[in-house]
Amino acid sequence: NKKGDRLFADWTGTSEQVKGAINNTLSFTKAATYCGVKCILPNDIPANEGFFRCVEVKAPPGTIANGVLPAACAARGLTGFRMVDCVLGALAMMLPDKVMAASDGGNTGISIGGYDTERNPFIYGDFACGTWGARPWADGLSGNSNLFANMATQSIEVCEAENPVEILAYEF
């Protein structure tokens, strides 16, 4: 919702907090909201108090958008990634020519464990990055982490050099 020079993001109606670790803190919900808004702004607008002051975020306590203790939140990124997509969807209704489509919704965690040929145990963990949504003026970008994430997939060479695994294909 926009009024004058202010934008209002209201997460009322969001599901109640859950036992699983996908609950957000209010600060994380605000950050996801700011991320979605920042995506449509010119690059020269800094993410500072002036920007934050123009975006008001409301998230009722006790929801996955604003969990209260003892709400688990270690996997909050999975919810936060989708929240960015929700913000972009809302903004697309106001500015359809400036907003990209939803992304892959979050990175997929990969865990492989076992024993190498000398019976030494190993554990390999990585996150498979998907794609950003298509933009009104171009295709989406493949192989990037979610807009709200700060991670990248390890290179195949590093994966194979440090673990007893062989990557047969690398594609989405």
Please report, for each region that a protein language model flagged, where it lies by residue.
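Glycine/proline-enriched, intrinsically flexible loops and inter-domain linkers
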Residues: 1-172
